[in-house]
Amino acid sequence: MSAPRTLYDKIWDDHLVNQQDDGTCLLYIDRHLVHEVTSPQAFEGLRMAGRKVRAPEKTLAVVDHNVPTSPDRHLGIKNEESRIQVEALARNAADFGVEYYSENDKRQGIVHIVGPEQGFTLPGMTIVCGDSHTSTHGAFGALAHGIGTSEVEHVLATQTLIQKKAKNMLVRVDGQLPPGVTAKDIILAIIGEIGTAGGTGHVIEFAGEAIRSLSMEGRMTICNMTIEGGARAGLIAPDETTFDYIKDKPRAPKGKAWDMALDYWKTLHTDEGAHYDRIVVLDAADLPPIVSWGSSPEDVISVQGAVPNPDDIQEETKRASKWRALDYMGLKPGTKITDIAVDRVFIGSCTNGRIEDLRAVAKVVEGRKVASTVSAMIVPGSGLVKEQAEAEGLDKIFKEAGFDWREPGCSMCLAMNDDRLKPGERCASTSNRNFEGRQGFKGRTHLVSPAMAAAAAVAGHFVDIREWK
């Protein structure tokens, strides 16, 4: 009888092609997502070597990082570098026979939102993309992670990837989430607990009642930010919630193929007695709405808290780092989080740009107005999300409240397109990174949930969503 295995062990074993004595392994890759930023050199490498894409039907190309989200984007991309990258992806997809969603295709959007929407992402698969937030797809019980440009070329050419196996880590969130606390708060709390290096060398499996109670969209938010916790990939075992989400998607198996897939997917869970190298346990009842205060995703605190004093940190290097963060953020120790005013609000990204996120925002802002001191924008994660939001009338709620309703794309999550902060501007953002300059040169980013961002837009400063009337 074989030893008990974790979910990660099972997916790894099912895709192992070869293993060397030093632990170097060759893994088969089921799905490959590509976008315009990390793929041009990879396709050019194939072209120069005279190679084809080995399995074009297992590759999907989407533009997202560089595309403008303004209503006039049909007029073309003004930035020359961005335009060149987008045009290169269109040309490469055509030359190599890869399916491609252009900025004019309603299926276009952020690659990690598009994959699940299309049923391209399925349980038990290995999924890669030249993007660190590929971990998002782990919400389906898929082993998904980012790869570098040279690896993108390797996967295009061989449909395999050279890797070494990571360690197993379990993060269990027990109990029920209190009102006002969301998946975004869970993952920020986890990163605050383990630090940005806490998952280094591991694949994290998320489990527990609070995780199980989440929708697929909430689970994607959790797995999306696994990389911010230092782990390469995050996993949540598939269940009926997963299967119900997938069933009607365009690329999902149909008929007998569905029944066969379902039988396999139901085996994708960690066996009782399986070994984890590290276990972290949180109690959902203890979790508040969370706001980041510094320039690292681990710099988080309750909305009811105050900016911490770095002098309380024993370790000298870390203490200096946190003082630098406060200086960059223009904050002083002891400042109440609810006293921090914001200039901008960004709602979107592959972390929180899905329809449930937008519904949560609409509940907060309906019948209210964005503060006169705030500029706020909402960027749907895909054309299909935008279409659904407009069918539900959410866009009218947003526009009447004073939000800028945009076209789909990565937008202000990162300063690679026209949507960016000006120096010194402070932003409540539903994205995933608050590094220095992430949203624009000298821009200041606070990571929050969609509901918290929406409330900040109306109030002009951070407020506790639990007290929102």
Swiss-Prot record:
<dbReference type="InterPro" id="IPR033941">
    <property type="entry name" value="IPMI_cat"/>
</dbReference>
<comment type="pathway">
    <text>Amino-acid biosynthesis; L-leucine biosynthesis; L-leucine from 3-methyl-2-oxobutanoate: step 2/4.</text>
</comment>
<dbReference type="InterPro" id="IPR050067">
    <property type="entry name" value="IPM_dehydratase_rel_enz"/>
</dbReference>
<comment type="subunit">
    <text>Heterodimer of LeuC and LeuD.</text>
</comment>
<dbReference type="GO" id="GO:0051539">
    <property type="term" value="F:4 iron, 4 sulfur cluster binding"/>
</dbReference>
<dbReference type="InterPro" id="IPR036008">
    <property type="entry name" value="Aconitase_4Fe-4S_dom"/>
</dbReference>
<keyword id="KW-0028">Amino-acid biosynthesis</keyword>
<comment type="similarity">
    <text>Belongs to the aconitase/IPM isomerase family. LeuC type 1 subfamily.</text>
</comment>
<keyword id="KW-0411">Iron-sulfur</keyword>
<protein>
    <recommendedName>
        <fullName>3-isopropylmalate dehydratase large subunit</fullName>
        <ecNumber>4.2.1.33</ecNumber>
    </recommendedName>
</protein>
<keyword id="KW-0004">4Fe-4S</keyword>
<feature type="binding site">
    <location>
        <position position="350"/>
    </location>
    <ligand>
        <name>[4Fe-4S] cluster</name>
    </ligand>
</feature>
<comment type="function">
    <text>Catalyzes the isomerization between 2-isopropylmalate and 3-isopropylmalate, via the formation of 2-isopropylmaleate.</text>
</comment>
<keyword id="KW-0456">Lyase</keyword>
<feature type="binding site">
    <location>
        <position position="410"/>
    </location>
    <ligand>
        <name>[4Fe-4S] cluster</name>
    </ligand>
</feature>
<dbReference type="Pfam" id="PF00330">
    <property type="entry name" value="Aconitase"/>
</dbReference>
<keyword id="KW-0100">Branched-chain amino acid biosynthesis</keyword>
<dbReference type="InterPro" id="IPR004430">
    <property type="entry name" value="3-IsopropMal_deHydase_lsu"/>
</dbReference>
<dbReference type="InterPro" id="IPR015931">
    <property type="entry name" value="Acnase/IPM_dHydase_lsu_aba_1/3"/>
</dbReference>
<dbReference type="InterPro" id="IPR001030">
    <property type="entry name" value="Acoase/IPM_deHydtase_lsu_aba"/>
</dbReference>
<keyword id="KW-0479">Metal-binding</keyword>
<keyword id="KW-0432">Leucine biosynthesis</keyword>
<dbReference type="GO" id="GO:0009098">
    <property type="term" value="P:L-leucine biosynthetic process"/>
</dbReference>
<feature type="binding site">
    <location>
        <position position="413"/>
    </location>
    <ligand>
        <name>[4Fe-4S] cluster</name>
    </ligand>
</feature>
<keyword id="KW-0408">Iron</keyword>
<dbReference type="InterPro" id="IPR018136">
    <property type="entry name" value="Aconitase_4Fe-4S_BS"/>
</dbReference>
<dbReference type="GO" id="GO:0046872">
    <property type="term" value="F:metal ion binding"/>
</dbReference>
<dbReference type="GO" id="GO:0003861">
    <property type="term" value="F:3-isopropylmalate dehydratase activity"/>
</dbReference>
